[in-house]
From Swiss-Prot:
Belongs to the peptidase S8 family. Pfam families: fn3_6, Inhibitor_I9, PA, Peptidase_S8. Keywords: Autocatalytic cleavage, Glycoprotein, Hydrolase, Protease, Secreted, Serine protease, Signal, Zymogen. It comes from Arabidopsis thaliana. Glycans are attached at N202, N725. Residues 30-108 form the Inhibitor I9 domain. It is found in: Secreted. This is Subtilisin-like protease SBT5.5.
Length: 803
């Protein structure tokens, strides 16, 4: 009887679940349907009709087809975005001419979140000596000479005047002084864009600096529902409510603004973009997630970003900067940024994108497509330092932005020891809201742990303040991880986890432990490596195709001072009410616009250079050493390798005259795509019967996975600069990876005119090598090769793994 009853229950559940499962398979989601490149034989309205016919072929009614459509792109990008069931998407994928169909996902992308331009040699006015207490600068060369070279470069590049930089991000705060158009000339005649109005944004917010602005929210609203200003904490317009877009825009092309600083006067100085006279076109495609804290999350949809790319191309931008990337790896045909960038590059628009903030783990980088300039993050020679002093005389130098002062030494306690009754010690250890007992915290310094997913660091400081504390020591969860250095509400010292043991030992073995936290100071040339790769910067190998070495380059991304949104606080935390005009932020999001600004300058100097030529110039002239002429270090003090820094740290002034460039056309990228199985991107291009390997794309670096025996790699260089009227003779040199013999045929290249091309082979051969420890067979090893004529050094990174 029990068995019969069990069968009855099972059948009942089955009958209930079958319709439910069936309904799930019919659930609509937004998909992007991509057709590759246009054939060129259809008018705009014919392309739209063509798209509609495909959509209607899987829809039951005309009304359903029309209502499901979000975007229909026909100017540069060939495709549409629509609500589809999984079955409808699958049917479309099988149709002729459809290149890819992929699902939109709000969790797919995330935003990758002064002194920095001086650091790379671009300073407009006469520079200071940067001497401290009369001591000579510790650099091994004349800093002012570097600034003179930088000023000449800026003058020759006309500060980017005439170049239009498109920024796909969270919008712009147009009232910022960084976007003032005073003294700027007429808008370039090549500009075809618009100034789209919306909430708190009208046509008067565009000017001769912000020459255009648009916003894209159809994908966002289709997923989250109609826009609700209170829940969304955003503006349905190009106006920036986050700060990220304004920050990246002003870093790339902001005007020179004197006397700016972060909260408390930290980083006081001049804020300026790299190309201060370049024009800005804003494409807002990223938004706050409803009812979520801005510091914790944001979202950008494929369909919205592809629409932004399509408009930017049609509007006439010269450069696109996009500090956004996927959370998880995706193939090129499932990555809206890769697709949009390929169409941009076809029209010689240079695209720079951030590498991501998921380092230091391997295979974490975003934007790995070879037609994108992928930018990692380095530190600066400027630090914000506070001092933590314990009662036993022990002193810690601490990262800090807090300028608040303690009156004197105060009792020191560990957060779990001052917990509110009934609250877990873990919550107290993380200094979560209402976890600390005012009776035991009042007048004391509290040691808290940072944790992950445990609330904002600003919130921890507020909890200490709520409980009456006078200072906070915030310890990281693991050594060498990056700190978000923020301006807290109580005097705060940030320490690594290795320091915690020393502090706890003092607390528990001292009768009355005390601590004193000194306010933060701005320090230049601190006694630690500058120009190093920061731990959050994402790393190779390139999981989409290991034949392409990424990132391409690194640029400053730590504590960058730039414009901010007046609708957001310093920390992006809703409990933080402090509003400011300029803010410090860190991430590869900040590195990317540095390179975008440099690209704008190079575009101004060399308007006929292709996107690939500009990338090559930046990569092959990058610096191998830091300011002390020592190899650039990784976050842990070890020498950084190309998986972390690509071709190393960018030097815009050197990139202006690279000598030789590795050029690549749109056709070159299509041929490369054949090697990764993408054979139908362009109906006018057919893959050859013998497809060359991916490492033969004419790229300024070389990556060979699984080298066995001998591999020959082919490259072509183009002469873009000569010394005088004489013939230029370039000689090959190499530092080969361990266990690999590297030689070039020919090993001398002779050029007698600008524009001349020379082809050469580089032959890689494995040698007898003992693989032990870190040099196991599955490990990559690194090197470089160069061509030099005595004036130019054209250097390329090498990454090889042996089998």
């Amino acid at each position: 009887m029990k068995r019969i009853f069990g069968i009855f229950i099972f059948l009942s559940l089955l009958l209930f679940l079958v319709p439910l499962l069936a309904s799930c398979t019919k659930e609509k989601q937004v998909y992007i349907v991509y057709f590759g490149e246009h054939k060129g034989d259809k008018a705009f309205h014919e392309i739209e009709a063509h798209h509609h016919s495909y959509l209607q072929s899987v829809k039951e009614t005309e009304e359903d087809a029309t209502s499901s459509l979000l975007y229909r792109r026909a100017s540069s990008i060939n495709g549409f975005a629509a609500e589809l069931t999984p079955d409808q998407a699958s049917r479309l994928k099988e149709l002729k001419e459809v290149v890819s169909v992929f699902k939109s996902d709000p969790r797919k992308y995330k935003i990758h979140t002064t002194r920095s331009w001086e650091f790379v040699g671009l300073k407009e006015e006469e520079g200071e000596d940067y001497r401290s207490d009369g001591d000579a600068p510790r650099h091994k060369y004349d800093v002012n000479d570097r600034f003179r070279v930088g000023r000449k470069f800026l003058k020759n590049a006309k500060h980017g005047d005439g170049v239009i930089v498109g920024l796909i991000d969270s919008g712009v705060w147009p009232e910022s002084r960084s976007f003032d158009d005073k003294g700027m000339g007429p808008i370039p005649e090549s500009w075809k864009g618009i100034c789209q109005t919306g909430v708190a944004f009208n046509s008067s917010h565009c000017n001769r600096k912000i020459i255009g602005a648009r916003y894209y929210a159809r994908g966002y609203e289709r997923y989250y529902g109609p826009f609700n200003a209170e829940a969304n904490k955003d503006f349905l317009s190009p106006r920036d409510a986050d700060g990220h877009g304004s920050h990246t825009a002003s870093t790339a092309v902001g005007r020179r603004v004197d006397g700016v600083s972060a909260l408390g006067g930290i980083a006081m100085g001049t804020a300026s973009g790299g190309a201060s006279l370049a024009r800005l076109a804003v494409y807002k495609a990223c938004w706050a997630v409803p009812n979520k804290e801005k510091y914790a999350t944001n979202t950008c949809f494929d369909e919205d970003m592809l629409a932004a790319f399509d408009d930017a191309i049609a509007d006439g931008v010269n450069v696109i900067s996009i500090s956004i990337g996927t959370v998880e790896p995706h193939t090129y045909l499932e990555d809206g940024i890769a697709i949009g960038a390929l169409h941009a590059v076809k029209r010689d628009i240079v695209v720079a994108a951030s590498a991501g903030n998921d380092g230091p783990a391997r295979e974490t980088l975003s934007n790995p497509a070879p037609w994108i300039i992928t930018v990692g993050a380095s530190s600066l020679d400027r630090f914000f330092v506070g001092r933590l002093e314990l009662g036993d005389g022990y002193v810690f130098e601490s990262d800090s932005l807090t300028t608040l002062k303690m009156d004197n030494y105060a009792p020191l306690v560990y957060a779990p020891d001052v917990v509110v009754p009934g609250v877990s010690r873990n919550d107290a250890m993380l200094c979560l809201p209402n976890a600390l007992s005012p009776d035991h915290v009042r007048g004391k310094v509290v040691l808290c742990l940072r944790g992950y997913g445990s609330g904002s660091t600003i919130g921890k400081g507020l909890e200490v303040k709520r409980a009456g504390g006078v200072g906070m020591i915030l310890a990281n969860s693991r050594d060498n991880d990056a700190f978000d250095v923020e301006s807290h509400f109580v005097p705060t010292a940030l320490v690594f986890s290795s320091t915690v043991d020393r502090i706890l030992d003092y607390i528990y073995n001292t009768y009355e432990p005390v601590a004193f936290i000194k306010p933060a100071e701005t320090v230049l040339y601190r006694n630690q490596p500058e120009d190093s790769v920061y731990p959050f910067s994402s790393r190779a190998p390139n999981w989409v195709d290991a034949n392409i070495l990424k990132p391409d380059i690194i640029a400053p991304g730590l504590n960058i001072l730039a414009a901010w949104s007046g609708a957001d606080s310093a920390s992006k935390d809703s409990i933080d009410r402090r509003v400011l005009d300029y803010n410090l932020d860190s991430g590869t999001s900040m590195s990317c616009p540095h390179v975008a600004g440099a690209i704008a300058l190079l575009k101004s100097m060399h308007p006929t250079w292709s996107s690939a030529a500009i990338r090559s110039a930046l990569m092959t002239t990058a610096s191998m050493t830091n300011e002390d002429n020592e190899p650039i270090q990784d976050y842990d003090g070890s020498p950084a390798n190309p998986f972390a820094l690509g071709s190393r740290h960018f030097r815009p002034t050197k990139a202006a005259s690279p000598g030789l460039v590795y050029d690549a056309s749109y056709q070159s990228y299509l041929l490369y795509c054949c090697s990764v199985g993408l054979t139908n991107l362009d109906p006018t291009f057919k893959c050859p019967s013998r497809i060359p390997p991916g490492y033969n794309l004419n790229y300024p670096s070389i990556s060979i996975p699984y080298l066995s025996g001998t591999v020959t790699v082919t490259r072509t260089v183009t002469c873009v600069g000569r010394t005088g009227n004489s013939t230029s003779v370039y000689v090959f040199n190499a530092q080969p990876p361990n266990g690999v013999l590297v030689k070039a045929e020919p090993n001398v290249l002779v050029f007698d005119k600008i524009g001349q091309k020379k082809r050469f082979n580089i032959i890689f051969t494995t040698q007898r090598y003992e693989f032990t420890g870190e040099a196991r067979r599955d490990r990559y090893r690194f090197g470089w090769f160069s061509w030099t004529d005595g004036h130019h050094v054209v250097r390329s990174s090498i990454a090889v793994s042996l089998v």
